[in-house]
């Protein structure tokens, strides 16, 4: 039941909530080999209501140190008589040496004249889909920094596939079990106008997150120091550039939560070029990945494991679809929509490009291009509208993933200048997608499953990695936020708590009824059921009778008669 029927348009002023960190843990003992020690901490409260966010600060910290202990490193295992010993110490099959392929990542197996090339005299390139297969995925939406796989390894095979985009054959890395080319183009335009920021933001965040099991908690910016010598991101295409990334779109849309009289429409375009599947066994991971796994302490230390997860991802891609996509969010002026009596259908006809299903990346869009109605020039065109002082489109927020940077810049420039994208600009971008495809969708597999069981202490490392993934998601959770008013939902975006309001409310905490709702005083504003926010789960109890339990509480700070849906206690086998 609602708490009454008369809503208050103003609540007491909200106090900004600043980020609060826990105390640092004790330093670990000094590592006698690296001469480095580590410590870590946690976020206790995330910034909210205009307070200081927990942004850019790491969970873990490291420091140079001195140690009198002797550095004891395990000697590399000796290769067998039927194996070749790489300069790095890695072992490969003897038959793979002197075959023209760098089966040793350092190339030491090819200090000789090739005598038996797998593909004979033919030279086949590995395409971008093959080189970047297995992309890492971060459960909180961040782009990982390093690919865990060695996709320059072929295991002496010459498996190839015909690339229908250029009619050339490409050689498949050993890790890729299957690569199919099939070009599919589609365009979707939102069926209705988003009347508020919160509905759009909720939709964007839900699409971005790998799982919604623990609410809308997203982290786009890495904060932990990389384990790599150079920070090189691995995913293909323009999606890496912050200016074009979907994470930037969410950040820009979130800035409109405090701006009134704005509506939104979305246009999504996608060109899918291929699907791939990784092998189910005997995957070849990179030597650097193995070295980083070995460098992780057997005694769990949160900060070091978090660094690994931000480098490689919490999961890798077992199956994936590659290609390119663009997303446009039109920020519209509500007053202009009303003045011009514009309908959703009229706006849809104006802002869509008109991508046909008959798509060929060599020639562009097949068939007749979509012709916009005559009213569109005056309705959407930014230059015309601004001269008349009746701008409908305040801004177009653009995301481009896949394709070359030059083509993406041209697309963005066209949209920024005209407010619309023309077919030619779209075609020019689409032709470059095959050169730099992005991962469009994926089937994830936990990253710890890539740790070879033959590695010393493999089970301990796998369990530590599994624990780190669970703690990583729990660290960046909305359970560390204050509850919202009037049925608003919580979201966590890069260390800052946001309230996503129901359409009738606005404000940092959804504490204000919208002005339109109060114009007719005879129709009181309904107060929606207040939702409390669950605290974070307490630590697990000791094991008793093969079971353990943990508890949480309902945070109703500042709310009246609020409740939380769900269980206070959960149990697990032990």
UniProtKB/Swiss-Prot annotation:
Subunit structure: Homooligomer; about 20 C9 chains oligomerize to give rise to a huge beta-barrel that forms a 100 Angstrom diameter pore in target membranes. Component of the membrane attack complex (MAC), composed of complement C5b, C6, C7, C8A, C8B, C8G and multiple copies of the pore-forming subunit C9.
Transmembrane residue ranges: 212-219, 235-242, 344-351, 352-360
Subcellular location: Secreted; Target cell membrane
Protein topology in the membrane: Multi-pass membrane protein
Name under which the protein is recorded: Complement component C9
Keyword line: Complement alternate pathway, Complement pathway, Cytolysis, Disulfide bond, EGF-like domain, Glycoprotein, Immunity, Innate immunity, Membrane, Membrane attack complex, Repeat, Secreted, Target cell membrane, Target membrane, Transmembrane, Transmembrane beta strand
Cited CDD domains: LDLa
Lineage: superkingdom: Eukaryota
Pfam family, one: Ldl_recept_a
Sequence ranges assigned to domain LDL-receptor class A in this UniProt record: 77-117
Residue intervals of the TSP type-1 domain: 18-72, 531-572
Signal peptide: none
Keyword Protease among UniProt keywords: no
InterPro entries according to UniProt: LDL_receptor-like_sf, LDLR_class-A_CS, LDrepeatLR_classA_rpt, MAC_perforin, MACPF, MACPF_CS, TSP1_rpt, TSP1_rpt_sf
Main location, first listed in the record: secreted
Gene: c9
UniProt keyword Secreted present: yes
Family: Belongs to the complement C6/C7/C8/C9 family.
Cystine connections: 19-54, 30-65, 33-71, 79-91, 86-104, 98-112, 119-158, 350-376, 481-497, 484-499, 501-510
An example Gene Ontology CC term for this record: membrane attack complex
Domain MACPF: 115-480
EGF-like domain span: 481-511
Glycan-modified residues: 3, 231, 261, 533
